[in-house]
Amino acid sequence: MHELAMKKCIGKPIPEWDAAHRLEIDQSTGPNLQDFGTIFRINSIFMDVIEPSFLEKQWFIFGITISFAAALNGPYIYSYAYLGSDPLSERLITHLMALTFIFIFGGITWKFGRGLFYGLRHQPIRFHRSLNRLYAIRSRRYFAKPGEGDIVWEAPWSTESIFCLHREETSFGVFFHIRHYTLSDNGNVARVFSIGREWTGYGQIGMALAQWNYWCAYMNDGPGDLPKPMLFHTQQETLREAFLFSLYSFGLRAPAIVRLLMMPLILVFTVMRVLANATCRDPIWPESIERISQIAPDDPYAEPRPGTPVGWGDTILAQQRGEYPDNPQAPVKDWKGEMDEQKNAAAWLENPAAATRRTARGRP
């Protein structure tokens, strides 16, 4: 979800649906824990995670490009009216149309295009288990002082923190993602950011809950017993990776015929993603965060390490060779609730608090 789309919550109470579907850091939400492609790197000290727009930014770039092209029609319409011999009244109408194109579509381009171009290639969210805090890079700092880094928000990892499963209903369907809310003194939303990836439709709620369990297991118990992530995303995106991001945005397991039909659009998405990345730079952590994020050279849990596949292409090839697990997951320790992931997700959606109480009592 685009950052500006979340700002509609600022100054208002937490959305009612979100408030009813809070995620607790000390209570498992399902029988499994699994990562579904949200991780850059992991070690004993911290874990860097993506935010939703990282996977889908080619769609935003495509929309911004169309909006920019529409805005360029304004000067064309104006020149047509200026050079024409139409009556003054008709030329005034044409001038008004030109200004409308410029201001409306130009405004959309400026509002939603900032950050996609000349911003950051990615905005990692750092789960820092040593300090029980989250550090989220939110935007590029263009005139930073030495050591200041980019703009970072902090959030405590505590039972008082407000994490929710957010539901977004659009004309393309229902989407879910995990959010953190920071409230002001009057109880309204002061800050909000999303973590990880989006989940499409109610059928993927079980996956979202398994992903939350994965992050909680890391923060609460460390990386020792975690299954491998689905993949480690590259922080140095290549042309091949840009193509695979665009290809898989139509579905990881989309039929070959669908991919062939969508190939022209996939290629356009690839070019746009590459061009946008070329205008951006890598994020810079403030020195204060870098100092507390030093890992030991012999950290046994530091990944990716030499030999570990990174990115879509290398990971898929490693899986085909049997060198990297396919669909790695693990059961939640001491889980007492419903063992069927879909049934558990349905019960949690209907009433999260009641589902948690039943699980605590050992009832499915």
Description of each model-found segment:
Residues 1-39, 201:
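Short, non-transmembrane cytosolic segments of multipass membrane proteins
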Residues 2-3, 48-62, 144-145, 185-193:
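Short, surface-exposed beta-strand/loop "edge" segments at domain boundaries and coil↔beta transitions
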Residues 40-56, 176-178:
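Short, hydrophobic/proline-enriched secondary-structure or compact coil segments at domain edges
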Residues 42-45, 215-250:
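Juxtamembrane amphipathic/hinge helix adjacent to a transmembrane helix
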Residues 49-122, 239-323, 327-364:
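Alpha-helical transmembrane spans
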Residues 108-149, 153-154:
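Conserved beta-hairpin
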Residues 135-173, 312-327:
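Acidic, Ser/Thr-rich low-complexity segments on the non-lumenal side of membrane proteins
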Residues 155-230:
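A membrane-cytosol interface segment of integral membrane proteins
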